[in-house]
């Protein structure tokens, strides 16, 4: 009698059970939540997930729903190639995201004694029949793709966002740009999987509930969609306090993601102000810190993984409490009537400021610091569509990043923002500081050499 053949990888009965029930599993599971949980559990790497999402041109002949179904199927089939423990890890992942029917379906192929002798904390909380579960919205449904943290809650493992956020088409490059910049040179931007890292922090809530940044969730979605199209690895966070923010900043910039990346972008969206000439940043617990402390983190000694790499820091919040009302264009002709804005035609807006009550600036290389306004002035955010600056930046990037370098993108963004007005005629002007950013940065969306 021949001994049973030794199986390598996932047992055959498990592989066949997934394949046999593939359509049911797609129907019974949420793709975005399952994809994120598989990365967090270590079933798949971010690169593996991206490979399953790349349909090699098929989307041109498929509608959006069919594309998502195909990506869902490829995700599950990829798991069948992930070793002998992947099946039980998948069951655990399904329980963690409350897809209990799918978990029970996978469990049905085995005898009870073949299940792993452990159970996760999430499984203990949710291991009930589906009929007993109340269909409550997921955290993502209520607060968007950003991860918020309680006051003393640990940050946890660094996990890239892998959900899909819809948005306008981002035009794709037809080449890697740089040949026309022989004098200045260009930053290297050609990797498929290490093109860039985005750390996005969007603080919306504060101790005073009346100061909630209404509409700011639109900015998170716009930025995530844009940088997904640029092939960046994205870490989105929401309400964090000052201590959590700096721990997060250290954790991200010392990670292998940043070590291997070609470019780093940080966007911090919150309330800000200028106090005695120093620009301040506010966190969700009401604590305030000098903006310079955040910039200092990117010095060479503190951030060795980003030496000689382009660093883009975006601070789209108030830098004071003054309203920029501009000056009339008709100063040379006093008889020409001055235009007055009609209030009913303008959307409701909020400013991004802290209510009002130097040391030497360290040198930073290869760094662009981007602001939504000039020093001393407030910024504006539409309650329905998001902040003026972020929305215009995303729009200009989508239209021009395929053939335009970042500094020209910022100039075009500033021009577009400068054309907007509030009900009372207030405006704002974007600005940026070039700190040794001595080459051109092209994002080259959709084109890869590596």
From Swiss-Prot:
Q: Where is this region: Required for binding Diap1?
A: 114-125
Tissue distribution of the protein: Ubiquitously expressed in embryos during early stages of development. In late third instar larvae, dramatic up-regulation in salivary glands and midgut before histolysis of these tissues.
Q: Does the keyword Transmembrane helix apply?
A: no
Protein's cellular compartments:
Cytoplasm
Family matches, as SUPFAM superfamilies: Caspase-like, DEATH domain
**CARD domain location, by residue?**
64-109
Report the superkingdom from the record: Eukaryota
Q: Which UniProt keywords apply?
A: Apoptosis, Cytoplasm, Hydrolase, Protease, Thiol protease, Ubl conjugation, Zymogen
One GO molecular-function entry = cysteine-type endopeptidase activity
Question: What is reported on the regulation of this protein's activity?
Answer: Zymogen activated by autocatalytic cleavage; association with the Dark apoptosome brings multiple molecules together to facilitate their dimerization and activation by autocatalytic cleavage.
The UniProt catalytic activity note for this protein reads: Strict requirement for an Asp residue at position P1 and with a marked preference for His at position P2. It has a preferred cleavage sequence of Leu-Gly-His-Asp-|-Xaa
One of its GO biological process terms is: determination of adult lifespan
CC annotations in GO: apoptosome; cytoplasm; nucleus; plasma membrane
EC number assigned by the record: 3.4.22.62
Quaternary assembly: Interacts (via residues 114-125) with Diap1 (via BIR 2 domain); binding blocks Dronc-mediated cell death. Can form a stable complex with Drice. Rpr, hid and grim can out-compete Dronc for binding Diap1, therefore removing Diap1-mediated ubiquitination. Interacts (via CARD domain) with Dark (via Dark CARD and WD domains); the interaction stimulates Dark oligomerization to form the apoptosome and brings pairs of Dronc molecules together on the apoptosome to facilitate their dimerization and activation by autocatalytic cleavage. Binding to Dark stimulates apoptosome assembly.
Q: What is this protein called?
A: Caspase Dronc
Gene label: Dronc
